[in-house]
Amino acid sequence: GGGLLLHNPSETRVVSPSGPLMNNIFEISVLPNEELSITHGAFNRYYNPYPLNAYGVSHHSEGTWQNLPFSVLRGARSIVSVVPNPTNQSQIFACAMHDGLLEINDGVVTNLWNQTNSGLESLDPIELNQNPNYRSVRIRDVAFDSEGSMWSITSFVGKGLKKRTVNGDWESIDLTGLIPVNQATGYSKLVISTNDEVYFGSALYGLIGYAEINGTPVLRSLDVADNLPTVDVRSVALDFDDNLWIGTTEGLRVLYNASRLFTQSDLSASTLVLEEGGNIGELLANQFVTSIEVDGNNQKWVATDGAGVFLFTEDGKSTLQHFTKENSPLPTNSVRSLAYEPQSGKIYMGTPNGLVAFQGNAYSPSENLKEVEVYPNPIRPNYTGLLTVHGLQTDCVVKITDIVGNAVFETTTTGGSIHWDLRSFSGRRVRSGVYLIFVTTNDGLESAVEKVMIIN
């Protein structure tokens, strides 16, 4: 591999001379302690995992690559996703699109879950006109709910949605009421809300949602009749406001207040309209959306197959950044995977030709205001960037004044950081001097004061 490219507006540098097992990146996963796992197995546009790739899993930790070669993966081919257990930092699961689910503890493979030793199922060869002895356990993804139960999604299986409780019991959810077995070709990654509602995309039947409402299982879907541009949903992401962002092979939609999917029958997804430069148009119309990430400021990062990576404002109505191979270190405009690392603020972008990291300036919310930081500080002449304040909580009021108390900027946080363009309410850049930054939580119980020197 060629190492990891770290990009910020002023420099691009290779972080380590070692690298992933190969530059062909299929999916990136962020693990605890700023670690990364990268898969190289794959499926094609139609979720076909053949030819079955015998590739290992790349792992980046503490500045070095500590990769798991295929030889230790118990024969699991076409590994497409790695997911950490949020209640056990030393445990991850690797999803294989043919051989089941690998359990890895402290970097050692300890189990290969399949149809012989778990509640997972192989596809039905008779249903699919295959050799009766054919077995294929096609696990696209797993995700964990608030109780620590692990959910998984499997292709070409009637009861394709599985739940493994912390006690090791398996439960199966029948999807055939929405999706015939022979058309359950593939699914997106899973997203689980704070209320334990499960959302995922399907190749042929749109967005799928599952929840238990007052103890009753509810299975719902959205398709083109509900304003999706196509039934082929490739990526889903929940933001801080319980809005579900839906990426398809033909564009982007949003389901506001997503939990309504389970209680209302007349829902439709919303099209986002972008107005820039006097032009009005649909956001990402006809674009193949491959991956969506929500950063610590509730901004939306969207990867595409052919148009690079976009960063949109919280509401999706303005473009903050658009990275392409022409204006950034991206080696190609076909970007398969995004991963946001909340501690560092980095966004990782995985492509068929390599991995790029962008040093973003959105951080996850802090638990208190004890470590508020301001940078750059001081701000020197000719600096044209933003001032960043991070270490904040959500819904803090941030007020910036000059040394005698005249307010020049005020905002309310949506995540762990805010940015100021150094302009006052008049729109002009502020004068040289010391400025005070007052931060107060929305309940008024915590506060912090910082200073910044601005030199023009």
Where are these regions (language model features)?
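Interdomain boundary/hinge segments at the C-termini of tandem beta-sandwich modules
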Residues: 454-456
